[in-house]
């Protein structure tokens, strides 16, 4: 059982991801912005982070910069929706995201990515 940190400012997205990931026997931590996500990562050292890009206070890209500055080998899957998502996801890849998903996405594909990233 892996610990997965889900970071998204939209509670319905977090709830959906929690349901899917817990159904696959993972423990899920939740944060609504990058600041809280960084705090949880430091306190709990999850095995994987799934983060949205566009969030208030500290967005996913800013959080990824901080994560890579402070910690080694952080596994991140980035997701984004909206008009700027394609460019933001390219930047996320450059910052070290292992996988990227444009919202809306297929939960089966995300779950496959989670399993792959946890195994490698």
Predicted features and spans:
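Hydrophobic/aromatic residues positioned on beta-strands within the core alpha/beta folds
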Residues: 79-80
């Amino acid at each position: 059982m892996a610990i997965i940190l889900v970071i998204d400012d939209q509670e319905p997205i977090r709830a959906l991801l929690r349901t899917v990931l817990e159904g696959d026997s993972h423990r899920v931590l939740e944060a609504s912005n990058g600041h809280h996500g960084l705090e949880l990562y430091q306190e709990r050292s999850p095995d994987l982070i799934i983060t949205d890009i566009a969030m208030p206070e500290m967005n996913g890209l800013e959080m990824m910069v901080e994560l890579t500055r402070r910690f080694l080998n952080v596994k991140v899957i980035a997701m984004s929706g909206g008009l700027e998502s394609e460019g933001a996801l390219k930047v996320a890849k450059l910052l070290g995201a292992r996988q990227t998903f444009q919202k809306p996405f297929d939960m089966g594909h995300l779950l496959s990515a989670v399993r792959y990233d946890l195994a490698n």
